[in-house]
Regions:
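Extracellular mucin-like PTS domains
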Residues: 30-45
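Blade/loop signatures of beta-propeller domains
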Residues: 43-80
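Short glycine/acidic-enriched loop and turn motifs that connect beta-strands
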Residues: 64-65, 109, 147-153, 200, ...
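Short loop/turn segments that connect beta-strands within beta-propeller blades
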Residues: 114-117, 166-169, 205-209, 245-249, ...
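C-terminal region of N-terminal signal peptides and the immediate post-cleavage residues
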Residues: 5-28, 284
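Beta-propeller domains
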Residues: 105-115
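Extracytoplasmic beta-rich repeat domains
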Residues: 20-23, 82-96, 122-137, 144-161, ...
Length: 411
């Protein structure tokens, strides 16, 4: 009875959604070179010391626009060089900087691994739950921590933390208390910005951890902030997406998911910013495109299931998965479906594009490599649920359920 009721509820939820809105390439869609066009440059960081390897993948989604697209890199099939056993769920991908892969486990361990060998260089046991990627800038790792276990606890007394570490030694530089925090940090303009379960978006001084501003949304904030062209964009469980001034927290605009029988979908996913647009999925099963300058709805596209995954932006397409088990390539200007890949399991994790190959994992614990242009299946790997992969241009670092794999092409 419960299963039947849930199925009926979901069917009603989908069928009563607002109609999909078809977009136009002539309205708030920028393809020429400029600040609103797609770039693949990682988030800006100060130059590393000459003796240190470079910063390659400094933040969740590769850059602060959260584009999730790396220009070039290894191609499948792959073989494994080494693997690191995390001991608990690896829900979000690592960063890669100074020759170190830094990743968090769901049970609160933050570990910095030698990218060449997989050996741990330092480890921090927080005693808290974690559901976020760290960020790296200026030889500092910034990490988000949730409440202490149980991880599904609720209550006003719970809190979270943002902690800053020396990237090479793991020494704690500062820690700040925020609400329960599963928002991957955004580092830009001397600030570290996160969202939390209290509905707050908080900016902390990157050097000291002192709060600089706070903005309250209407409900929980679980996604990471995205930043482009002087606008910090983030979604909320109240069904809204807001654009804020990144230095002051002042509200620039507020947009909403489409209404259905008196309610709206909520935004868990992290937005991607490209072409003068905001691209983000919602729990009403739709992917939305809003104008980055105006906040106006430019298109919406139904997927048949919750969209917890964040989108990757490749060329002029939006690549995103759905709980329906379908993975979509959507036209970035109009929302039209370019192609669809049907996987045998719900898709909750976010995809990443490396070269012209898109990687996505399913809750059935399989990672798929697809041709980004056509959706053709190129390779599968029997592990992975959420985190997909990152690269340094030579290796593929694939996030399994509890293991991180370093891989190179076969042959």
């Amino acid at each position: 009875m419960l299963a039947a009721g849930a199925a009926a509820g979901w069917f009603l939820h989908v069928r009563t959604a607002g109609r999909d809105v078809v977009g136009s390439p002539s309205v708030e869609f920028v393809t020429t070179a400029g600040p609103a066009a797609v770039t693949t440059t990682p988030a800006a960081t100060a130059p590393a010391r000459p003796t240190l390897p470079p910063v390659i993948w400094p933040t969740y989604g590769l850059d602060n626009r959260r584009l999730r697209t790396f220009p070039g890199g290894p191609k499948p099939p792959f073989r494994t060089l080494w693997s690191y056993r995390g001991g608990s769920l690896l829900e979000f991908p690592p960063t890669l900087a100074y020759g170190r892969l830094t990743i968090s486990t769901n049970r609160g361990r933050l570990v910095s691994l030698d990218a060449a060998t997989g050996k741990a260089r330092w480890t921090f046991e927080s005693g808290r739950c974690v559901a976020a990627s760290p960020a790296v800038a200026n030889r500092v790792v910034y990490a988000s921590f949730m409440n202490r276990p149980p991880c599904n606890a609720s209550g006003s007394a719970l809190d979270g933390q943002v902690v800053a570490f020396d990237a090479l030694t793991g020494k704690v530089r500062w820690r700040a208390t925020v609400g329960v925090n599963e928002s991957s940090p955004l580092v830009a303009g001397g600030l570290v910005t996160v969202g939390d379960w209290n509905g707050d978006v908080t900016a902390l001084d990157a050097r000291t951890g002192v709060q600089r501003w706070r903005f309250h949304t209407g409900d929980k904030v679980k996604g990471a902030p995205a930043l482009a062209d002087g606008r910090l964009v983030i979604g909320s469980y109240d069904g809204s997406v807001v654009a804020l001034n990144p230095q002051t927290g002042a509200l620039l605009w507020k947009a909403s998911a489409q209404e259905r029988i008196g309610s709206r979908g909520t935004f868990y996913a992290t937005a991607a910013l490209a072409f003068g647009r905001v691209y983000v999925g919602a729990t009403d099963g739709k992917v939305y495109s809003f104008g980055a300058e105006s906040g106006k709805l430019r298109w919406s596209q139904s997927t048949g299931g919750y969209v917890y995954a964040s989108a990757a932006i490749w060329r002029q397409s939006v690549l995103v998965g759905s709980y329906s088990g379908s993975f979509f390539s959507l036209d970035a200007a109009t929302g039209a479906v370019n192609w669809r890949f049907r996987a045998p399991g719900p898709i909750s994790g976010s995809a990443v594009v490396i070269g012209d190959v898109v990687y996505v994992a399913t809750l059935a614990r399989t990672t798929y490599a697809l041709d980004a242009a056509t959706g053709k299946l190129l390779w599968t790997f029997p592990d992975g649920q959420y985190g997909a992969a990152i690269t340094d241009g030579t290796h593929l670092y694939l996030v399994g359920t509890t293991r991180l794999y370093a891989m190179v092409p076969r042959g």
